[in-house]
Amino acid sequence: MIALEIALEKPNRRVWCLDGDGAALMHLGALPVIAQRKPANLIHVVINNAAHETVGGMPVCEGGLCAAKVASAVGYPRVLNARDEATLETALQEAKGANQLTMLEVACAVGARADLGRPTTTPIQNRDALMAFLREEKA
């Protein structure tokens, strides 16, 4: 919902929302609200590994979540899928050129880099950095 509000408040900025499939499933009620508001500058990317990676890779649900089908069902006007590097590149180019609310579902495998560290900033520092960024006027 943060990305939706940013997109509505900053209609001249392209807003990319990155979501995991587990997070999208837990906040499923947000999708119809976003679809109803239809911000043309919002690209909603769902990274779908069919698992809650941050809690040990527990499966999200039997058979996984098809975020693209859910987005289409609730009214997202443009829905794209990427299943490999080639389709990802094509879908990203399409999403960049879209002038309408777009969902891009990206399939990937469960797993993280072994050298992936923990955040080095606090949630308050992250909030302050985001607020400062949003106050900047970009051409």
Language-model regions: role of each:
Residues 32-36, 61, 96-97, 120-124:
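Short, solvent-exposed amphipathic alpha-helical segments in soluble enzyme
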Residues 17, 80-82, 106:
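General beta-strand structural signal in soluble alpha/beta enzymes
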Residues 44, 79-81, 103:
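Conserved beta-strand scaffold positions in the cores of enzyme catalytic domains, especially
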Residues 1-49:
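Thiamine diphosphate
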Residues 53-55, 90-91, 111-117:
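Short active-site-adjacent structural elements
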Residues 47-57:
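Long, charge-dense
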